[in-house]
Regions:
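Bateman (tandem CBS) regulatory domains
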Residues: 27-40, 101-114
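Short, positively charged and aromatic/hydrophobic N-terminal segments
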Residues: 11-15, 24
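Residues that scaffold the ATP/ADP-binding catalytic core of kinase and kinase-like folds
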Residues: 33, 85-86, 158-159
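The conserved cystathionine-beta-synthase
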Residues: 42-60, 66-67, 116-134, 140-141, ...
Length: 171
């Protein structure tokens, strides 16, 4: 039997049956999905454009979180942000040199607010809303300190596992 996506009704059932309840709402601790900062590729906002590009290339990501010297979340930068910034500062493509990539920092190309972080105590509904729009969701604490990311794939794996558990109980 081929796998089909869970319906909204079965997701609600999973959430209610799979977690402790308070009143009418189920609580999911989103920390269980967290990839901690120590395991996440990120850039510092004071890195040069060249350093940022090298790190993106080395790890093969198309977008990564950016933090400042105090580990506070600043935003996300993508390969597209790098490309558009390089092109806007170099009118001729053949004038792009490594030296020109040393003049600007990552903080100069960040589009703040493009990807909003969630707080570690955020509810599952808000996390799901953010994860629908991007491959990862940055997670911060109550002081805006970056503590890691939650990937959309981890959330999907969780719901698939819960859907299978529900299906097995019905057999």
């Amino acid at each position: 039997m081929p796998w089909t996506a869970p319906s909204k009704r079965s997701i609600l059932r999973i959430k209610i049956n799979g977690h402790k309840r308070t009143g009418r709402r189920s609580i999911v601790n989103i920390a269980s999905f967290l990839s901690p900062k120590e395991e996440v590729t990120f850039l510092r906002d004071d890195m040069t454009i060249r350093q940022g590009l090298e790190k993106l290339k080395r790890y093969g990501y198309t977008a990564v979180p950016v933090i400042d010297a105090e580990d506070r979340y600043v935003g996300v930068v993508s390969e597209g942000d790098f490309l558009w910034n390089i092109l806007s500062h170099n009118s001729e493509l053949d004038t792009i040199t490594m030296k020109s990539l040393e003049k600007l920092s990552v903080r100069d190309i960040i589009q703040s607010g493009k990807i909003r972080p969630v707080c570690i105590d955020t509810n599952m509904e808000e996390l799901l809303g953010q994860a629908q729009m991007q491959n990862f969701v940055p997670v911060i604490d109550d002081r805006n300190v970056f503590i890691g990311i939650i990937t959309r794939s981890e959330i999907i794996k969780y719901f698939i596992k819960k859907q299978i558990e529900v299906a097995e109980k019905q057999i």
